[in-house]
């Protein structure tokens, strides 16, 4: 049998050579498509419900947010465990499902039950990203010569994160550091009393004037004009000229009872990092953590992330601003493969 096989191989050299090349090509393709991880992902299917209720104590958050959501989620099928945590201004409810449960099925069931929950005004509900505890594959910082933390945070929120979320396989980008811009309204109590106003009146007036509304179509001959009201606040001047009330036909503006200045939202923490490769240490900055969607190929996702970052650095971000990687899962994967290969060889 072996002699006949050798004879056929010698007689059909071209066919055998082509077959060997095809087999080698298939092997190379299979290797490139192989999902190589530093450690296996053995996490159960889990859905996290995250509700922000700013400024509320833990007891109030638990009564108005956590307990109603827990009751609604009791009817979700195939759930193994339910855990919740309530802190100041935040509630997190985690559901762990039976082994083999499809991720999208689990999230759909949770969303259907959440529709029946009546949350108080001001509460923001969201589902956690479709990732796992080992889904963190890349970290970067945003640096800019001559740019403030407010400006870097704006670039992160409005340019960098939306662009990176377009990369296939990305579940979410977690934002750390920076300072969020806000308008500070410093009210003069004596002026409020003079015009017969309260803090609630000022708050309602600002909310009512910070919106745009749609109108209708006005026909003018063969043309049509779209009518709309543009009221979105875009600058300090827009805010200063917000009308609070009218006395005898004379408007009372916000600037008459308060001063308006550009400020920053009080941060809940500070980001610091040490880049040993460049010998740079920073006590503040803006960082992004890239989370991979469950079941994706980390090598391919990382290639897409790096390509997008290179594009942003060269074509999109202003001069002096750059995205610098500080953690890359590729290094860990290569180190793990080298260790495994060395062990097998020995």
Language model region names:
Residues 1-345:
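Membrane-proximal extracytoplasmic
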């Amino acid at each position: 049998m072996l002699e006949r096989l050798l004879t056929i191989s010698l007689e059909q050299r071209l066919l055998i050579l082509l077959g060997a090349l095809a087999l080698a090509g298939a092997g190379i393709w299979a290797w490139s498509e192989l999902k190589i991880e530093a450690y296996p992902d053995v996490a159960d299917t889990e859905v996290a419900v995250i509700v922000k209720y700013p400024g509320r104590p833990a007891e109030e958050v638990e009564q108005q947010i956590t307990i109603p959501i827990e009751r609604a989620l009791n009817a979700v099928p195939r759930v193994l465990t339910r855990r919740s945590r309530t802190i100041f201004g935040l509630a997190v409810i985690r559901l762990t499902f039976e082994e083999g449960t499809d991720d999208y099925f689990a999230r759909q069931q949770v969303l259907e039950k959440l529709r029946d929950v009546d949350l108080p005004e001001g509460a923001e509900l969201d589902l956690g990203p479709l990732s796992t505890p080992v889904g963190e594959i890349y970290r970067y910082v945003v640096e800019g010569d001559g740019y403030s933390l407010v400006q870097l945070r704006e670039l992160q929120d409005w340019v960098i994160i939306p662009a990176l979320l377009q990369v296939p396989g990305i579940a979410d980008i977690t934002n750390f550091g920076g300072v969020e811009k806000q308008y500070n309204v410093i009210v003069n109590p004596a002026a409020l009393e003079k015009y017969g106003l309260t803090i609630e009146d000022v708050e309602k007036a600002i909310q009512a004037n910070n919106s745009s509304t749609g109108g209708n179509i006005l026909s003018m001959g063969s043309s049509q004009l779209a009518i709309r009201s543009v009221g979105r606040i875009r600058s300090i001047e827009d805010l200063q000229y917000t009308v609070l009330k009218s006395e005898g036909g004379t408007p009372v503006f916000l600037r008459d009872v308060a001063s308006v200045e550009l400020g920053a939202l009080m941060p809940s923490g500070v980001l610091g990092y040490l880049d040993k490769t460049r010998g740079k240490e920073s006590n503040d900055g803006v960082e992004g953590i890239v989370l991979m969607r469950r079941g994706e190929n980390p090598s391919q996702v990382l290639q897409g992330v790096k390509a997008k970052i290179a594009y942003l650095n060269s074509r999109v971000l202003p001069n002096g601003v750059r995205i610098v990687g500080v953690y890359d899962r590729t290094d860990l994967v290569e180190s793990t493969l080298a260790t495994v290969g060395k062990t097998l060889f020995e």
